[in-house]
């Protein structure tokens, strides 16, 4: 299997807009017209239907795990291509005119498939920061930074490069949240 085919399949799997699909099917609403207008799991939770929100979270994680694990088993040389393409599929899905989610749940799927240790570090730091500050966006950004720094200083530098790319894209997708955090107008989450 060649790198192009792996990239396309991973991208297409990552681009399945589960938040959009689930809110259409179960709530008869367009998630892009709810809350932040984002198709991801956090905004799916804002619909008021926790089942839709948590199912979106799980499916957004799984849509990265499936191609990354498959490539990890059969085509190890293309592991980072599959990881990045699945992630980019979520953030820039072809089905929704390249306007997707912020990428955090899909990023979680990638790091879980690549390293359960990174997944645990992310999870613990995200929960701690969320309980401390009550901002999902801030917790996601800082936790992604923590994973990159941990990888850079203590792990494989090849992995650090892909994690740096994820960090830059997550910062980009959270640019409006960053402005709201600076202006003290970012919505806190309820725990």
Q: Which residues does each PLM region occupy?
A:
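Transmembrane alpha-helix interface/packing and boundary motifs in multi-pass membrane proteins
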Residues: 11-15, 24, 87-97, 129-134
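Cytosolic, membrane-interface loops and tails of multi-pass inner-membrane proteins
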Residues: 20-53, 175-191
